[in-house]
């Protein structure tokens, strides 16, 4: 909603100076050229991208595993607010309508390795983003989702 979007915009502007030393050079360039966040033509909030590819806040740990720089700073106590809910939910996208919220999977080739691993480990997308779905919709909503998913899978 508009309040959540405004809070996220302010949050990203506020924490950027603290995050900057931890970010990759190409991420810093993308942020400084595009801003700490972008509002699309549809009014949706997105993080800036490096060359229309990965998120500008993406970092790599010593094992070359891709991580969210905002989430890492939060986990280390450097910032007090976790990454934006839209990032936390990804690859799930939520589109709010007047009567309901549509929850959809966003397929992007940049995420194909993660999808392959999820398939191999038998971790469906909704379980992968469980914490984020609970953060967005609450425990009760998520438990209802699990029931529906089990029912759906039992019919296959």
Regions found by a protein language model. Give the residues of each.
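Short loop/turn segments that flank or connect secondary-structure elements
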Residues: 1-156
